[in-house]
Amino acid sequence: MNENLFASFITPTIVGIPIVILIIMTPYIIFPSPTRLINNRLTSLQQWLVQLILKQLMSIHNTKGRTWSLMLISLILFIGSTNLLGLLPHSFTPTTQLSMNLGMAIPLWAATVIKGFRHKTKASLAHFLPQGTPIPLIPMLVIIETISLFIQPMALAVRLTANITAGHLLMHLIGGATLVLTSISPATASITFIILTLLTILEFAVALIQAYVFTLLVSLYLHDNT
């Protein structure tokens, strides 16, 4: 019986009960809040990384935008940790599910848009009609800008889903080819194993980059509306 390539993306269950919630909570179990008065090296490294990420994300924001710092740092840590945990053998990556990514993207995008219309109504409406637009093109440009606005959360979710899913499929295919070639051609199997190792290293980088890109785009949407 042939193995389904997409079997690893099916939501795992125990006695018919989905365990996605347990998987999502795993990063919080692995990285608990420090309770010591003096931090150890691991905690100090984590805090340094958090401060570095905050500096990169919050440098473009004003006072109102910086109130989202906790939300943005939680978002990037959550996506990054779930992506990395999904690279472990026999594990499940929640960010390969489009429904989950849409569940993150739509509320965050909607919050930034509502915030913009609430505090900067004229500036938000001005985005639908660029300055200097010829009068005959006004209706068409308004429609195009409206569509592009509503596509933003879909683009966020699809980008994350596609990149993570594609990487897992490539690793699955190359890993399967390596196992098959082991008994047929050990020399070729060693080459595919080296490729698999390099691809795994690349996927670790992609897991972190996609978390940063997702959070950075949310930060840019927030900057446009504050």
UniProtKB/Swiss-Prot annotation:
Pfam families given in the database record: ATP-synt_A
The keyword Transmembrane appears for this protein: yes
Secretion signal, residue range per the UniProt entry: none
Residues annotated as transmembrane: 5-25, 68-88, 97-117, 138-158, 164-184, 189-209
Reactions accelerated catalytically: H(+)(in) = H(+)(out)
Highest taxon of source: Eukaryota
Topology in the lipid bilayer: Multi-pass membrane protein
Cellular localization per UniProt: Mitochondrion inner membrane
Main location: mitochondrion
InterPro entries, per database record: ATP_synth_F0_asu, ATP_synth_F0_asu_AS, ATP_synth_F0_asu_bact/mt, F0_ATP_A_sf
GO CC, alphabetical: mitochondrial inner membrane; proton-transporting ATP synthase complex
Any Gene Ontology biological process: proton transmembrane transport
Keywords (A to Z) from UniProt: ATP synthesis, CF(0), Hydrogen ion transport, Ion transport, Membrane, Mitochondrion, Mitochondrion inner membrane, Transmembrane, Transmembrane helix, Transport
The UniProt record lists the keyword Membrane: yes
GO molecular function: proton channel activity; proton-transporting ATP synthase activity, rotational mechanism
NCBIfam families: ATP_synt_6_or_A
Record family assignment: Belongs to the ATPase A chain family.
Function: Subunit a, of the mitochondrial membrane ATP synthase complex (F(1)F(0) ATP synthase or Complex V) that produces ATP from ADP in the presence of a proton gradient across the membrane which is generated by electron transport complexes of the respiratory chain. ATP synthase complex consist of a soluble F(1) head domain - the catalytic core - and a membrane F(1) domain - the membrane proton channel. These two domains are linked by a central stalk rotating inside the F(1) region and a stationary peripheral stalk.
Complex and partners: Component of the ATP synthase complex composed at least of ATP5F1A/subunit alpha, ATP5F1B/subunit beta, ATP5MC1/subunit c (homooctomer), MT-ATP6/subunit a, MT-ATP8/subunit 8, ATP5ME/subunit e, ATP5MF/subunit f, ATP5MG/subunit g, ATP5MK/subunit k, ATP5MJ/subunit j, ATP5F1C/subunit gamma, ATP5F1D/subunit delta, ATP5F1E/subunit epsilon, ATP5PF/subunit F6, ATP5PB/subunit b, ATP5PD/subunit d, ATP5PO/subunit OSCP.
Protein name: ATP synthase F(0) complex subunit a
